[in-house]
């Protein structure tokens, strides 16, 4: 076999304990992966190393002086002149068929084999972007191939270019690779047809040059030659596969012939000879494949050029699929396993895609268990923390294929399922797809255990459980799995408090809900909101002493947490159905669009008419459980209430409103009260309900004010000790007053001053983390009161009073921002301060045009205020950096250390903290812009944030800077 | 190769398997003999290794036919799986063989290889085994459909592989599920033998006599029927079946060719299932026989069966032909020996053979079933050491609460000796739901009796006790009979029935050598005679009671 050009420290293909290029274990998942083009590696070090070890060419024993003089002539040739090669020209000519090119070469070879061979080698050199040529004398001695190539390489190095056909963007090379592949396919085919592959040395002669080139220190030559060799091996594999089929056919024919009662000896001998020939050819191909694998692949799969590595691994995947009898074994799979840790993204992605095909091939399952046990940890790691999103997504798909084969344990499946809460939407969606597959598989197992779907339906049809659906099993399994995923992340008080702040407007979608929305898009069964509703309302779990009914009902019975997830599934289902069914096609003609709109309106009314009674029933059923009731109310958040105009809905709305009133006034759970408030605000947009709702809100507010005065009227807020029981009462009362101030203008109330004073006093209490929730409500209530203030067009006599009130509130907020020990309360105070300023500026724009007043309002953003805000923002960025594992970037010069709140490093917390930081940053930048206090130092501070905390925050900063 | 032409020489070279295969099998057979004679030893390993080397030598031939390679690899895997735990090697060899089968469309061979692969996966990756077998069942069903259409006569019954794969799923599926699958498939294709197999696996055989030409299947069916009866506590019915087994075993025409039982799909195709050797069968029959009569404390039949079974365990000869089966058989014999000891102890205790029971107890090691704890408690209770007995019962109930049978038995015994009525009532309440739901009705009967006893003779329970007495006869539980009769006679007072019941109870207790209950029932009889002024009978009974009292005092003096 031919020798390599160089004799470096290449591995001989033995078993390896470690991968050739180790991937760093401390990847930053938030940073974007660098492009392959930016990873163009310099060949200088490699070439220097190779050059220092280069052998001197062996002296030619023949001593032909003419050859030496001709080699010298090659070097002396004018390098600028373009050397013509007919094969290369034909290849670039799109009109010439590649088969014709191959056939013409063989015709030339039949006439003059040496010239044809030299022409072919020159063709290969042209494909390498090498403007050099050899002559017939060089191909006469195959042993001199390495020496000849060395000389060519030396002459080309001085004029080398990085642009060569395989990676060129020149238009004339746009189909180069595709046509080259076709040409090589036809070439190998012709070699086989003409028996040159088995009975001639021409193939070996050609390959000796190709193998020598594949070890060149020049990248264009090395890459192109490697591609030649890999493609040729691919086509040899295809030929080997054909021979295997022929072998099988001949074997069967021989068996049949031998079993005949009247044996045909001639036919048997003929078949035996045919079999012998096939076996011989198979052996020849197998020898070729093994030799070229050892000569080329073993070295090039570790090449410094990522493209070469990618090509090697892609072709290895093809070989394994084509000829598994040769390549599907641990000896070859391990190369793929090692390259899972390659530093290049494209290489890793290629390996993952190749492996997924293997795991999706049923016949390969027997040979993949050992590979799985060895490399699945790495694959799971790639799914969870790889730097490139594309690789992560592909790895999750690979994990799904591995799971389908049974190679993932339950704990490993859970690791992937956790990714449904990942911060990246693509990863989320792929993980949800994985989740749906897991659920389907589990459900099918359960149904098989209980006796198939038809049997189950028949059993239930004989009972009084008429609302039962087999899909309940699926919904139940989904809820149980999501519970397991959710509980794997430890929830903390700080997380819950932050979540409450940002759920205030009802538009915040929880990660679980987002996952379920994705599931609804993936599997239409989850859009069956009627089935889900019936499942939610079902409560007849008493034993019927009938199997499998009891087993199924026992399985479908959910605990509170699981029911909460089920309600979120129902919410996602409703959202998906509404979004999917009521989107007007853009291409529809106007008239048709009008008709479609009318039909959709009718469908929508019908949907709401069917849906609202279910929701009323669900809320009534779950009224005893605060958590479930909150999730039930959130079902209404999924619906566009302004679209509900059907008169038949009024009865259901009346019931809903009465229920909401009852929940608001009697329930002490903060989330319930907030939910009712949001729904009242939304229901107010329905014209038919305005009058009734107005009366109801007035009644609610009156009762709430009475309650507030009863609790706080004579209570020494600033100094008194609040007991546990009092705390619960106060918390609920303040939450209700917060809701009422959102619903109605309180400035007309005679008790307004007392309420205002009490709330300000509450904010002035000594900081106590136990009472933070009381201050949250107080802050929000004061904000609402100020909002109503700003909206009123008062006479000038009230301006002074308004200013005094504003000053009191702002002073309290500043005091909290500077002095309170609760960082979450500081955050809330900062957000309220910023929102109030933004709100005031917005109201002012519609009320005042006096420039003097504008200048007066800027006094609110005093330097000490700005410093306090920046300090708070920096603290949250510090926490976000810790949780998200980013490098922390300071905003201020303050030397005091930052303390991190108690949030674990998991995707849930990272998502929430991202939201917090983006919200706070955007509001701060808006206020600074409005106040016209931007300084170069300030801009510089925020400019440095770009790229450090993820794309969302960077986008906000970019918008500000622009 | 002097004198051989090129063609003959080539044939000889490429046909080396014709020589090496038989040679390898010779080594394997000799290894099996060594295994049966000496167990796992060095010579066995050497013989096995040499045989494998012969097969590996066949694989060295690069010109062998694909079928030869496939069969050689298959045989290597079978040997490795039977005698070693070299699963990685088996996987690699099987992988190549599967590829060959796939390439050459050798479907039957592919199925057999997949079956071997599933055995590997069952040990290395159970989930993968489940996936593999699920796919294989589906493939085999499709293959069977196609084969039926084309009526291929050159191959074995195509349905065979469906059954093979279904049976292989027993490794990770419960028996009833697998049995149902087999039953459905066999019922659809009218494979009667396989329907029978499904019923055996599901333990749902009808109690009628099963007509079959195979002695092995006949014995298997009878044993299954007995197991069904014992599971429900129907001892009398089990005793009726037992003579049929004995008769079959003693028959001159009885044949037990091997440990494998064949279930025929058609006249030629069959499924062979490993059950047990003839030696194992005799041990099992002795155990079953002893168990059937263990509740009959009036005779020593149970102890005789169990003693004989224990005796022949010492002479047990292994007939297994592979290491894994040998190890499994050894484990089986250890377990059955332990079971026989336990039941023998129980038999001795029920007949007050305390010295014999003590001797076996001292030589018995602790187990993981909790049954030994109950036996120790029973022994101490018989000796009159109620406090220590209570400790054993409580510990057993606490430590083995997850085993329903053990928990119920230990708690019932505990209730029987508790002096604290409140504690006894709490125990009764704790096990009442379990007894009511349990398949063995005997537990419920015992519960009822204990409740009646605890309520005292003042409460006239005219319905419960007669029902218990009747059902205890059906379940052939002698102890339950005489205890119930004693309690019922006490409640009848001066009625004539009281005498009859007391006499019956006394007779049963005498036969069971239960001195304590002899004394109790004797005193009831004595009181009855006094109440009806039959003073001669009263004095005679008083003398007997005095003797029993003396015996009991002697027993308690050792405490």
Swiss-Prot record, chain A:
Record note on quaternary structure: Cohesin complexes are composed of the psm1/smc1 and psm3/smc3 heterodimer attached via their hinge domain, rad21/scc1 which link them, and psc3/scc3, which interacts with rad21. Interacts with swi6. The interaction with swi6 may contribute to recruit cohesin complex to heterochromatin.
InterPro entries listed in its UniProt record: ARM-like (IPR011989), ARM-type_fold (IPR016024), Cohesin_Scc3/SA (IPR039662), HEAT_SCC3-SA (IPR056396), SCD (IPR020839), STAG (IPR013721)
Similarity comment: Belongs to the SCC3 family.
Segments of this protein annotated with the region Disordered: 1-72
Role this protein plays: Component of cohesin complex, a complex required for the cohesion of sister chromatids after DNA replication. The cohesin complex apparently forms a large proteinaceous ring within which sister chromatids can be trapped. At anaphase, the rad21 subunit of the cohesin complex is cleaved and dissociates from chromatin, allowing sister chromatids to segregate. The cohesin complex may also play a role in spindle pole assembly during mitosis.
Residue ranges occupied by any SCD domain in the UniProt entry: 297-382
Entry-linked Pfam families: HEAT_SCC3-SA (PF24571), SCD (PF21581), STAG (PF08514)
Protein name, entry field: Cohesin subunit psc3
Coiled-coil blocks: 236-275
Keywords, alphabetical: Cell cycle, Cell division, Centromere, Chromosome, Chromosome partition, Coiled coil, Mitosis, Nucleus
S-S pairs: none
GO BP term, pick one: cell division
Compartments where located: Nucleus; Chromosome, Centromere
Listed Basic residues bias regions: 51-71
Feature: compositional bias, Polar residues: 21-30
Gene Ontology terms: cellular component: chromatin; cohesin complex; condensed chromosome, centromeric region; condensed nuclear chromosome; mating-type region heterochromatin; mitotic cohesin complex; nucleus; pericentric heterochromatin
Swiss-Prot record, chain B:
Keyword entries, A-Z: Cell cycle, Cell division, Chromosome partition, Mitosis, Nucleus
Classification via InterPro entries: MAU2
Pfam families reported for this sequence: Cohesin_load
Any one annotated GO CC term: SMC loading complex
Location(s), subcellular: Nucleus
MF terms (GO), sorted A to Z: cohesin loader activity; double-stranded DNA binding
Keyword Cell cycle: yes
Keyword Nucleus: yes
GO terms for biological process, alphabetical: cell division; chromatin looping; chromosome segregation; maintenance of mitotic sister chromatid cohesion; mitotic sister chromatid cohesion
Role according to the record: Involved in sister chromatid cohesion. Forms a complex with mis4, which is required for the association of the cohesin complex with chromosomes.
Full protein name: MAU2 chromatid cohesion factor homolog
Organism name: Schizosaccharomyces pombe (strain 972 / ATCC 24843) (Fission yeast)
Lineage start: Eukaryota, Fungi, Dikarya, Ascomycota, Taphrinomycotina
